[in-house]
Amino acid sequence: MAAPAPRARTGGKKKDERRGFKGYKWEFRDSNKDFWAQGHAECKSLIMILLIAAMVCFQRVATHPIVILLLTMELSICAFFFFLYSLAINRYIPFVFWPMMDLMNDLACSTFLIGGIFFALEARRELPVPYLTGMILMGVTAFISIIDLCLQRRQFKSRKLRKFILLTPDRKGKKQDPKLLLMLAAKEDEEERQRELAEKAKRESMDPGW
């Protein structure tokens, strides 16, 4: 009697399915999905467009170099975060909590731009139309930065913070057990389901015709 054929091992395939280029493609799609669905990509795109338009307006007239330097700095930082999320580079640097860095950048961007408006106002006595247009664009950019800052609150939910803590390696560079993340997610899903059932029972008790 012939010996039974050995079973194919599928565990290694599942383990390695997110490595290499296929893994990067998955991270690329998932990162861009979150980046665009949460509104950060739209805000950063508008910020970069407005900053470029403001620089063009200021370069048409005599402008203090500090104003141009400020706009160039903010444009560079915004472009850095845009390509960081678009190319999924943040997924491969897990020891940095990028939402916190992005929040600090939005706060600094709005603060510097508002300060730059007052500085540009004091730098000239006469305000030509291109100069005034650049100041208005700086104000709109600061407002959009505040909107992007408010959108960051979704990243600071307890579930995402716990996920980040579990994915962060320890001092020796070793990552935590991935089973802890699965157990935590299952527990939170069960708590959410119990909460929904309790709310449904409460509505039924208040409305007999429910």
UniProtKB/Swiss-Prot annotation:
Annotated InterPro entries: Marvel (IPR008253)
Name where it mostly resides: membrane
The protein's location, in the record's own words, is: Membrane
Q: Where is the MARVEL domain?
A: 35-157
One GO biological process from the UniProt record?
chemotaxis
Membrane-spanning segments: 35-55, 65-85, 103-123, 127-147
What is the membrane topology noted in the UniProt record heading this document? Multi-pass membrane protein
Which key words tag this protein in UniProt?
A: Chemotaxis, Cytokine, Membrane, Transmembrane, Transmembrane helix
Q: Does the keyword Transmembrane apply?
A: yes
What are the recorded GO MF terms, alphabetically? cytokine activity
Under the heading PROSITE patterns, the entry gives: MARVEL (PS51225)
The cellular component terms of Gene Ontology attached to this UniProt record, alphabetical and capped at eight, are: extracellular space; membrane
Family to which this protein belongs:
Belongs to the chemokine-like factor family.
Q: What is this protein called?
A: CKLF-like MARVEL transmembrane domain-containing protein 2B
